[in-house]
Each structure stands twice: as structure tokens, then as C-alpha cells.
């Protein structure tokens, strides 16, 4: 039963971190979308936002089944992201700047999610698969952003 408790605790924590990461990603995309000039870049980010949101719905269901309502990104992380985004775009409002900011965000997301996968080893298969799907969405976006850097 100790193992079962650890598994459900790890499952819950991993899903909460995925939920937080999705909210951070969607918020970041919303924040830069008004600064994008290239239609293809706009479409790339919009498609990624839809993928994040769709997976977010699945995560909400998984969390609800565990009696949890999710996790918002930390105020410090959100504030630092907002400041970095607005300062950089204030200095150079270009698609290259947007792509650079989003690339940094993807890198941080992939690194954090991978760390959480390693940390919450007891999480069940479904939640681990969800985290890997989210990493895949981030990796796809990262790859799509490269031509704009």
C-alpha cells in the first residue's frame, strides 16, 4: 500500500506539472501572438496552442478523476516570462524575437517535464504517456520555430 500511495502521489504531481506547463505555454503564445507578422509563424503557434489546449483538456479529466483541479504556473515564473517577453519585444518587435522567446520557452518546458518524469518515477503509465505527449508537442514547436530564428 505504500507503493500504491507513492504511485498515486507521483501520478498526481506529474499531471499537475503538465497542467501548469500547458497553462504557461498557452499564456506565452497568447502574449506574443499580437506581435507576429508572418502568417505561417502565426499558424504554427496557433496550431501548437490548439494541441496544448486539447491535451490540457485530457489532463483536466485525469486530474478530476483524482479529485484535483490542477495547478497554475507559479507567479514568479509567469512574472519573469512576462518581463522577458515585453522587454525583448519592446527592444525588437520582430518574428525572429518571437521565435527566440518561444524557443527558450520550449527548451524550458522540455527540460522541466523531463526532470518531472525522472522525479516522479512512481507515476502511472497514463500520466507518464501524457507527459511524453506534451514533450512531443514542445519538440514539434521547437522544430517548427527554427526557420524563424
Task: Enumerate the predicted regions with their spans.
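Short, Lys/Arg-enriched N-terminal segments with co-localized hydrophobic residues
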Residues: 1-7
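Alpha-helical bundle segments that constitute or directly flank the non-heme di-iron/ferroxidase center
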Residues: 7-36, 97-121
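Alpha-helical scaffold segments that form or flank carboxylate-/histidine-based iron centers
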Residues: 10-18, 39-54, 95-101, 126-137
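A structural signal for well-ordered alpha-helices, especially hydrophobic packing surfaces
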Residues: 26, 56, 60-63, 84-87, ...
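Short, flexible helix-adjacent loops and helix caps
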Residues: 30, 34-37, 41, 64, ...
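Conserved alpha-helical segments that form or flank metal/cofactor-binding pockets of metalloenzymes
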Residues: 42-76, 145-148
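Carboxylate-rich helix-loop segments that flank metal/cofactor sites and access channels
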Residues: 58-110
Amino acid at each position: 500500500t505504500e507503493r500504491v500511495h507513492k504511485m498515486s502521489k507521483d501520478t498526481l504531481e506529474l499531471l499537475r506539472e503538465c497542467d501548469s506547463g500547458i497553462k504557461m505555454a498557452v499564456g506565452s503564445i497568447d502574449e506574443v501572438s499580437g506581435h507576429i507578422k508572418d502568417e505561417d509563424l502565426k499558424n504554427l503557434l496557433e496550431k501548437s496552442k490548439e494541441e496544448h489546449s486539447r491535451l490540457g483538456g485530457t489532463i483536466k479529466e485525469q486530474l478530476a478523476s483524482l479529485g484535483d483541479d490542477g495547478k497554475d504556473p507559479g507567479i514568479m515564473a509567469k512574472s519573469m516570462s512576462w518581463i522577458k517577453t515585453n522587454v525583448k519585444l519592446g527592444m525588437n518587435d520582430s518574428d525572429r524575437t518571437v521565435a527566440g522567446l518561444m524557443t527558450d520557452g520550449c527548451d524550458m518546458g522540455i527540460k522541466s517535464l523531463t526532470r518531472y518524469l525522472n522525479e516522479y518515477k512512481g507515476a502511472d503509465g497514463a500520466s507518464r504517456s501524457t507527459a511524453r505527449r506534451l514533450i512531443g508537442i514542445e519538440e514539434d514547436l521547437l522544430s517548427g520555430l527554427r526557420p524563424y530564428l
